[in-house]
């Protein structure tokens, strides 16, 4: 499949989309890392800090001030694995971990941004904000219809300085308009909320290094997340019941976000919980209601 999707619950967004031979579109950081040797340095979070002039260092080097934010230097699995706030020098002495780094604890709005890029120049932006819970979890994400001009200006300039020669989708994670992570792929969790024809335009971008998406029918959407407890072996819910829910116009898609044939510990999940499902929708209250219903279905179907 030329659109490389490793999570089977997201292939629904790419089925039936024609992709020319020889064109490979990553939706996964590991695949993107292999595809783009010239630009894969962006997965080194030390360099993300360095290119922005942010104080940073390896574990073993003492920060000049606390608190700091600690995380793995490389993490191609995502989900905030291994990340934490370190409050003091005393705590730092106990928390040092090989392969980890620290950076400033940045405060502000947390935004996930997808940009369509042609030769290092952004041609299209879409921003998503998350309602955070604890320990790396999010309650839901709002896919915004409106722009974020300051993020677009800051990240656009960063792209021009650092990703000349790259054409494709870039995903930024920012807090307070500072880049905390960057990925050479799209946010495949909510591409159905970007509008009809968007995936086809992405294929055209990778095939022709050109962007032509009209984007004249934007609407705000929501990606609502269901978490369960760690260490539980969950079964899948009745697919026929899920199909009935998908017939509702306010619901765009539902993802069951785990491998039933894998042990819970074999999944990359945030410290706070095990992600079971995602409801993408056009109406937040409807999405929250479906999440509650799914939760009841999961508790009723233990493995």
Where are these predicted regions, by residue range?
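Short beta-strand element of the conserved SAM-dependent methyltransferase core
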Residues: 70, 102, 127-131, 174, ...
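Short acidic loop-to-beta-strand element that houses the catalytic metal-binding Asp/Glu
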Residues: 66, 171-175
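Active-site nucleotide/adenylate-binding loops and adjacent lid/helix of ATP-dependent enzymes
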Residues: 27-158, 297
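Active-site-adjacent "lid" and substrate-binding segments of diverse enzymatic cores
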Residues: 166-169
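ATP-binding N-terminal substructure of ATP-dependent carboxylate-amine bond-forming enzymes
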Residues: 1-50, 212, 261-272, 280-303
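An exposure/low-complexity boundary signal
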Residues: 2-19, 182-195, 242-270
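Peripheral (often C-terminal) accessory segments that flank ATP-dependent C-N-forming ligase machineries
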Residues: 204-303
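ATP-dependent carboxylate/phosphate-activation module, predominantly the ATP-grasp catalytic core
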Residues: 107-110, 115-164, 176-223
């Amino acid at each position: 499949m030329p659109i490389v999707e490793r999570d089977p619950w997201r292939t629904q967004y790419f089925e039936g989309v024609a992709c020319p031979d020889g064109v490979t579109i990553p939706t996964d950081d590991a695949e993107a890392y292999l595809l783009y040797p010239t630009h894969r340095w962006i997965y080194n979070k030390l360099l993300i800090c360095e290119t922005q002039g942010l104080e940073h260092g390896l574990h073993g080097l003492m920060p000049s001030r606390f608190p700091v934010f600690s995380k793995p230097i490389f993490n191609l699995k995502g989900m905030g694995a291994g990340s934490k706030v370190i409050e003091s020098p005393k705590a730092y002495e106990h928390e040092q971990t090989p392969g980890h780094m620290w950076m400033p604890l940045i405060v502000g709005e947390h935004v996930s941004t997808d940009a369509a890029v042609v030769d290092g120049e952004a041609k299209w932006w879409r921003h998503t904000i998350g309602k955070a819970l604890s320990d790396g979890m999010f309650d839901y994400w709002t896919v915004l219809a409106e722009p974020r001009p300051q993020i677009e200006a800051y990240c656009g300039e960063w792209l021009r300085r650092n990703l000349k020669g790259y054409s494709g989708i870039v995903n930024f994670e920012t807090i307070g308009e500072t880049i905390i992570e960057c990925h050479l792929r799209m946010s495949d969790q909510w591409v159905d909320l970007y509008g009809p024809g968007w995936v086809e335009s992405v294929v055209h971008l990778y095939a022709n290094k050109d962007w032509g998406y009209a984007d004249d029918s934007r609407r705000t959407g929501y990606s609502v997340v269901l978490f369960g407890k760690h260490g539980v072996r969950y079964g899948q819910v009745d697919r026929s019941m899920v199909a009935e829910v998908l017939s509702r116009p306010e619901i765009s898609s539902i993802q069951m976000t785990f491998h039933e044939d894998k042990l819970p510990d074999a999944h990359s999940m945030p410290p706070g919980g095990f992600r079971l499902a995602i409801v993408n929708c056009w109406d937040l209250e409807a999405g929250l209601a479906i999440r509650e219903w799914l939760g009841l279905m999961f508790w009723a179907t233990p493995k």
